[in-house]
Every structure is written in C-alpha cells, then in structure tokens.
Amino acid sequence: MNTKTIVMKIKAWSFVLAGLLLNANGFPQDTNRFVFLCLGQSNMEGFPGIEEQDNGPVDERFQVLAAVDFPNLGRIKGNWYRAVPPLCRPSTGLGPADYFGRTLVSNLPPNIKVGIVNVSVAGCKIELFDKDNFQTYASTAPKWMTNIINTYSGNPYQHLVEMAKLAQKDGVIKGILLHQGESNTNDKQWPEKVKAMYQNLIKDLDLKTEEVPLLAGELVNAEQQGACASMNKIIGELPQAIPTAHIVSSQGCTGRSDHLHFAPAGYREFGTRYAQTMLPLLGYRNAETK
C-alpha cells in the first residue's frame, strides 16, 4: 500500500469519526449530558412558593435551559444555568422536575450531567400541545392563559421543539416528562391525544421511541382528596397507547389544600419517583432517596 493510499484512508476515517460526533442537526454533542423535556400544566410548571431548603445547594451538573428570559435571575432564553428553581418561568415555583434532576445526578456517574427543558402552561388541556390544531384551543383560552401562551411565542409545542433543538446541540434527549390531565379529567381520548403529541415530538426532533421513553405522573391522589383523582385511571391506560410510556404514582405525595396541586414535600417525593422510574430505563440501578 503506497503512501498516497494510506493518507486517503486516514482522511476517509476522519470524516466518519467527525460524523459520529455530530448529532442529526449537524452540531457536536456531549453524550454525557442527558436532556429531558418537561411539559404539562401548573404542577409541571412548579406551583409558586419555594422553601429555603429547595434553593440550594444545587449540584452544578444539574442545569436548566431557560425557555424564556428570567430578568430577575439574569437568565437569557436559550442558555444553560444551574437548576435553581423556578425552572419554567419567573413566576413559577418548585415542581417535580427539580427533584427529578437532583435525584438523577445523585445516582448517576459523576461525569454525567442532567439538563431540563420545561415548557408548561397552567390550566391547559393537552390540546394546547396539538401540533396541528392548537390554535383552535388557544383561541378560546382565558386572558391569563393567553398571556402565558404568548411567552412561548403563541405556540408552546413549537417553542418546546425549538428549545429542544438548542439543547440537542449540547446533549442527548433521553426522555420526556409529562404532568397534565387536570383540565382533561374524564377525557377517555386523552391517551390517544398524548400519543399524537409524543409521536410528533419524536418525529420533529429526529428521535427514536425506543430510546426516549415518556414518563407521565398521576394527579393528586384520591387519598389526598385530589379533585381530579378520577383521571388517574385514564392516565394509567397510557402504556396501552404508547408502549414506551411509564406511569409515576402520586400515592402518598402530599397535596395542597386546593386538592389540585402538590405541596413542596409532595413535589420532592414526586420528582424523586420520576427519577426512580427513569434510572433503570437509562441502564442504572434504581435510586435511593438522597
């Protein structure tokens, strides 16, 4: 084999290696940054009210990609920051994503980072995340909800996709976290509506269902006098529509007096359970509460 042939083969392998280090959008990825998309209603937003113990210290390996500007915290949309709550928008609070991420980094190898992208809208039906028909629902939304929708350029689904694509430049999407259903209580078509949304996300982000599970959390449980607890039966049917869906139990997670939202202690436990569900799916042992 002459020198010219050897040089050509080295160049060819260099191109192959470069391709392996780029994601589908042509950007270098950190395969040790695990990214999780979060969406839903006010419980996934994080209900206002953050207790002192939840403000820190937060491991620097757990970060949030700001989906909107946070002027009061100096966060700029589209950039990564240490995941000190609130994670969704400036007016939101502690939610399940907080202790999901904290529990993950406590149980994953020290070289693994965790990133959250949270686009959620209080009070919304799942129809707001319908890629093709969201405008029909959004046009009937009350003004306070419209104001939230407008922080996402009027299209929360598309905004989530855009933020997720930014996150894909820096990491690999490993899962989708959903907490929604209060506004769809007793809607038997909810699993199919979630399926359509999930499939659209998978397609639009060039993902594979077998590599990106969907974790759906129950609503405030009946044993906490949850106002929408009847919806948990329908939520439990989601794996029949989406084989890669997993249900996170809310039993024992403390609720607030409104019977719709979780208390801070409830969010801590619930977020830990999301993480305990995700860890085996990532190939790691089940988490102990830390």
Give the positions of each predicted feature.
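Cell-envelope and extracellular/periplasmic
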Residues: 29-290
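Bacterial Sec-dependent N-terminal signal peptides
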Residues: 1-31
